[in-house]
Design a protein with these regions (language model features):
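Bacterial extracytoplasmic/cell-wall-associated proteins, especially those involved in peptidoglycan
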Residues: 2-122
Length: 122
């Protein structure tokens, strides 16, 4: 294994854990949030560092490698990380399950979009 493969694996794991009950499209949208954080300079503008810090804060389980949604995430991840696709989150820096958005949160931040069961905010 080479360093870039390990890095991509950690990025994929962070995206999967963030939206494991969602489709791969939601997982890829989460990847876009990590990309937006990177562009904003979080953790010295390092995508890998953004993802592993998130994984450390939110430890959890691991995907079933036979899961078709996880396989689609792996297949399409590089199109997001290389900047080949448009940001469907409109610059969001955070994501949250839509059913957890309260009035205090919605008054402090703006929801940029909702994809699947997640709302994307900035």
């Amino acid at each position: 294994m080479i360093v870039s493969e390990f890095s991509k694996a950690q990025i994929a794991l962070a995206c999967w854990r963030s939206a494991k009950t969602e489709t791969h499209l939601v997982m890829l949208s989460v990847c876009q949030v990590f990309m937006n954080r990177t562009k904003a300079g979080w953790y010295d503008g390092d995508l890998y560092e953004n993802c592993i810090r998130w994984l450390a804060e939110f430890p959890g389980e691991f995907p079933d490698l036979r899961d078709p949604q996880f396989q689609q995430l792996l297949t399409n991840l590089e199109t997001v990380t290389s900047g080949m696709v448009q940001d469907k989150t409109d610059g969001a820096l955070w994501f949250i399950p839509t059913n957890q958005i309260g009035k205090s949160l919605s008054s402090q931040f703006s929801v940029t979009t909702t994809i699947g069961g997640l709302s994307f905010i900035k």
